[in-house]
Amino acid sequence: MTYESSNDGGSRQQILVLARADADSVQPKTELALACFGLDYNLRSQIVKFNRSSADYRIVVKDYSEYATDDDYNAGLTKLNTEIISGNIPDILANSMLLPIRQYAAKGLLEDLWPYIDADPECSRDKLMTKPLESLQTDGKLYQLPIDFGVTTAIGLGKVVDGYDTWTLADVNDALSKLPEGATVFNKYYTQAEMLQYCVAMNADSFMNWQDGTCNFDSDEFRALLEFVKPFPAEYDWQSDSEEYESDYSRLKNGKQLLYPTSLYSFDDLYYTFAALNNDARFVGFPREDGSTGNAFNSDATLCITTTCKDKAGAWAFIRSTLEEDFQKSLWNFPILKSAFEANAKEAMTQEYETDADGNQILDENGNPIPISTGGMSYGDEPMIELYAVTQEQYDTVMAVIDSTTSFVDYDQNVMNIISDEAAGYLAGSKTVEEASKLIQSRVSLYIQEQK
């Protein structure tokens, strides 16, 4: 007997009868190696489904997170990266925003997926969400395809952050000055190291170009990033903190905090954010000196086909299966398939009402129909908020956030280590921001050249 459950809430039990088969009657399948560092639940389920349904291919997963140790969580990530760079390359990569995909692409290790999309009779560019894919392109080529997406951003209260034409470090400091003394930009628990990693991952494509082999850390934009990080504590002293815990939402509403860094993954997230902030939420993003929006797309998993893949048609067949309507509609995050996104939006904006046995709406004491909640969400010390239909204004807001976002979260552990090492002197006060940025520029430039 087997038991299966799915992320859309469905489940089933099956009684299976196993019958011995002649080995000669079993059609061999081409095995394709998929390497990852941790495997998303949705993707794992799709691999199982694909392996059962495909007569020609079988995806074999090697999860390098099993090499993580108590002393080094990233040991498996280092091992995977080392193997890829040395030529031991899998057929498919599943990236959970931790692999240096742009570096692999610059080395010629990854296939451009646009030709596969364009040649597929059941798929086309206009069937996919445009903005996340545009942000992943390198010189017009698409080396990784997300199964879903969210938007990493920063939220503020409209009464505080409205009225700014730009959102630079100076603008953030000006907005902060409107709050009571002692207010912080983000929650007081965030440290310099956490915020530095956050900001670099969101802005990596602004400072590094693997195709050209160049970087731009000795710049006003990067120095502004370091200056933004410096006011955060090096470590947070939890033992000396006698105050009761307050969530980001509570601190925002109480004037103790300017911004809340978060990610929008679904229409439920959108509704909750507006409700928790009394409909005064503004998705202003992180400060950027170049005038662009300080948001970045993210994904639970992006998929790549390597140039050494033993059967690229088979690899694409698997990736193509993640774009099927049923799979896309079942995802927790925003679907990358446009029709599934639109279907989810329509469902989120449709309000259901209580009815009697005959299907007639039940009215409250004021003669109004009684809306049905689709569930509830809570965060930290915030009370449970019942979820109802998303309004047109809220939908327009999230679409504006998506349409204005041009970056995708990108992470390279080696580059992050260099930045952390050289930024430490500035953050501790022993170096100027100019000295730190020049050292980072020099070391990252050398690292890029060594990787060619």
What are these regions (language model features)?
Residues W114-K127, D205-L226, G285-A296, G429:
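Short, solvent-exposed loop/beta-turn-alpha elements that line the ligand-binding surface or hinge
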Residues M1-P100, N360-L363, G367, D421, ...:
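Conserved N-terminal structural module of periplasmic/extracytoplasmic solute-binding proteins
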Residues F274-T355, D403-S404:
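Extracytoplasmic/periplasmic substrate-recognition and gating elements
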Residues D212-E246, Y272, A281-F286:
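Glycine-centered hinge/linker elements that transmit conformational signals in sensory
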Residues K141-T152, D171-K230, N254-L259:
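Extracytoplasmic/periplasmic solute-binding protein
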Residues E365-V444:
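C-terminal capping/gating helix-and-loop segments adjacent to ligand/active sites or protein-protein/ligand interfaces
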Residues D71-I89, L93, R102, D174-K178, ...:
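Short helices/loops that flank or line small-molecule/ion binding pockets
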Residues L98-T153, W167-D171, A281-P287:
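Hinge/lid segment of periplasmic solute-binding proteins
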